Amino acid sequence: MHFDLIDAVVEQSPTRIVTHKHVTNAEEYLQDHFPGYPVLPGVMMLEAMVQAARRLAGPKPTPLVLGQVRALKYGAFVRPGSTLRVTVDLHKHLGGDAIEFKGEAHLLTNLRDAGEPKVAVSGRFALRPVRR
């Protein structure tokens, strides 16, 4: 099963990517999380950062998978009707083609909102080639 958590790439450079994911009631994973108060599961927020990091890393001969997560912090619920703005920076290259990233996802309840949006999730994580 694959969930595409990138609706748009709004900025990209060799070391940074910014993406948007608009969360709707149609998202299958919101059906049971939580009944009567649907919110984007925390693991899906992490997956949004991982998908952005894969896109930033570019095509590889061996697919990149999540190898490590460090200092992951959650700060806000992401409800249907909101947009998650994901920013991922390439932090450093590790041994064996692994790459460490810093990620942060902000909650945008309205793309025209003024002020600083709330941080929904932030942390460091590493992607490494899949071991077959």
Task: Give the predicted meaning of each segment.
Residues F3-D4, L66, V119:
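Residues that act as N-cap/strand-start positions at coil-to-secondary-structure junctions
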Residues V23, L56-A57, L107-T109:
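Generic helix-packing signal
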Residues M1-L40:
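Catalytic strand-loop segment that frames the active site of acyl-thioester-processing enzymes
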Residues Q31-R55, L66-G67:
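Compact, glycine-rich, soluble single-domain proteins
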Residues D7, E11-R16, P80, T87-R132:
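HotDog/MaoC-like acyl-thioester-processing domains
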Residues V50-L90, R124:
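Hydrophobic beta-strand-centered segment that forms part of the acyl-chain substrate-binding groove
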Residues V23, Y74, L127-P129:
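Hydrophobic residues in beta-strands and at strand termini
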